[in-house]
A protein has these predicted regions:
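N-terminal, positively charged, Ser/Thr/Ala/Gly-biased leader segments
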Residues: 1-11
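Glycine-rich His-Gly loop
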Residues: 1-3, 54-59, 136, 168-170
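A short acidic, often aromatic-flanked loop/helix-cap motif at beta-alpha or helix-coil junctions
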Residues: 30-34, 113-115, 139, 155-156
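Ligand/cofactor pocket segment of small-molecule handling proteins
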Residues: 93-130
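Cofactor-binding loop segments of dinucleotide-utilizing enzymes, especially the Rossmann-like FAD-
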Residues: 2, 27, 92
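Flexible gly/pro-rich beta->alpha loop and the following alpha-helix that scaffold active-site loops
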Residues: 13-88
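Amide-donor transfer/coupling interface in amidating biosynthetic enzymes
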Residues: 42, 106, 120-191
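Short glycine-/acidic-enriched loop or helix-start segments at secondary-structure transitions
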Residues: 8-10, 62-64, 97-100, 142-143, ...
Length: 191
């Protein structure tokens, strides 16, 4: 987890139902939420069955916010990809996976906040939703990636090796939405 707001939610519950033991790490503690330039050492992914990189309220490219630790996360994602460890990147996590593998991330033409539908090339992999969204950025995919879902704002899902990146939030719970709203989210919704 990148912060105290996000949690594995529905994805974590499904993994546990299937017998996986979850190990979660929090990069930015609650008291540093508005000053997230912390030091953090990411674990090596080699012994894991799966890496899930969740959302975050910051932008992957915002050096003042994430510059002190994003390099470590990008290295972890590159190594997981190299080793063939499956990666699920959600929102910020998908943007980090994109960046780690040679793509780029920038501002979206408009934010997406709330429930949206998407167009999917493979509905068995990515149903068309509606999906919950809360983001301001979009990905320009790395060379190896294949876009599998989109809408008029941005790529919504892509595959790359054994990785899957999604811009929406399949893990979302009402508890996390309330946390988003309590931490600057109400102001974002009013814009």
């Amino acid at each position: 987890m990148h912060d105290h707001v996000t949690e594995p939610g529905l994805i974590g519950a499904r993994l546990e139902e299937r017998g996986y033991d979850l190990t979660t790490v929090t990069v930015v503690p609650a008291e540093r939420h508005h000053a997230p330039d912390v030091s953090f050492t990411f674990p090596a992914p080699g012994d894991w069955d799966l890496v899930v990189s969740l959302g975050a309220p910051w932008s992957v490219y915002d050096e003042t916010a994430v510059g002190s630790w994003i390099g470590g996360e990008l290295a972890l994602l590159r190594e997981a990809h190299r080793l063939g460890v499956p990666v699920l990147g959600i929102c910020f996590g998908a943007q980090a996976l994109t960046t780690a593998l040679g793509g780029s991330v920038g501002p979206a033409p408009r934010p997406e906040i709330g429930w949206t539908r998407i167009e999917s090339d493979d509905r068995s992999l990515i149903p068309e939703g509606p999906w919950f969204q809360w983001h301001h950025d979009r990905c320009a995919l790395p060379p190896e990636a294949v876009e599998v879902a989109r809408n008029e704002v941005c790529t919504q899902a892509f595959t790359v090796g054994r990785g899957l990146g999604v811009q929406f939030h399949p893990e979302i719970t009402t508890t996390v939405v309330r946390r988003y709203l309590d931490l600057d989210g109400r102001e974002q919704c009013e814009r």
